[in-house]
Amino acid sequence: MSLSTEATAKIVSEFGRDANDTGSTDVQVALLTAQINHLQGHFAEHKKDHHSRRGLLRMVSQRRKLLDYLKRKDVARYTALIERLGLRR
């Protein structure tokens, strides 16, 4: 299930450089994180939905690749994004 338009716009405005910045790494990671969190609630109820679980694993992998890219290019932005999203403990 995808995020609503309002939720997407809110995330883009919060993490992007402007309201139309959907391509920056920060925004992409934040959107993937929101979708992953949404799907985790889905799997609490539908434990045998393996088709959607494959999509979840793709999203997690894509987020990992984007975070690795950001860590290589700009460590300060990487650590700030990790803190804002609460991804690492």
From Swiss-Prot:
Membrane spanning residue stretches: none
Keyword Secreted: no
GO CC annotations, alphabetized: cytosolic small ribosomal subunit
CDD domains with a match to the protein in the record: Ribosomal_S15p_S13e
Gene Ontology MF, one: structural constituent of ribosome
Family matches, as SUPFAM superfamilies: S15/NS1 RNA-binding domain (SSF47060)
PROSITE patterns assigned: RIBOSOMAL_S15
Superkingdom: Bacteria
Keywords annotated in UniProt: Ribonucleoprotein, Ribosomal protein, RNA-binding, rRNA-binding
Role played: One of the primary rRNA binding proteins, it binds directly to 16S rRNA where it helps nucleate assembly of the platform of the 30S subunit by binding and bridging several RNA helices of the 16S rRNA.
PANTHER family: RIBOSOMAL PROTEIN S15, BACTERIAL AND ORGANELLAR (PTHR23321), SMALL RIBOSOMAL SUBUNIT PROTEIN US15M (PTHR23321:SF26)
Subunit description: Part of the 30S ribosomal subunit. Forms a bridge to the 50S subunit in the 70S ribosome, contacting the 23S rRNA.
Protein name in UniProt: Small ribosomal subunit protein uS15
Species this protein is from: Salmonella typhimurium (strain LT2 / SGSC1412 / ATCC 700720)
High-level lineage: Bacteria, Pseudomonadati, Pseudomonadota, Gammaproteobacteria, Enterobacterales
Gene name of the record: rpsO
